[in-house]
């Protein structure tokens, strides 16, 4: 049995419950969300000036 410590990813969620799916598009379904395997890349999207007014948060997702 192999233990994989990287069995999670990060998704970007706004204050209204929508997930970032790429190219400035948002959707309610987590399965469509763009997933990031590094918190560094997720933070880059979160801090993007285009999305300041959306009140973004980073969500840790089990995969």
Regions from the PLM with identified roles:
Residues 5-32:
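Short aromatic-glycine-(Arg/Gly/Cys) micro-motifs in beta-strand/loop hairpins
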Residues 36:
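C-terminal catalytic core of Y-nucleophile DNA break-rejoin enzymes
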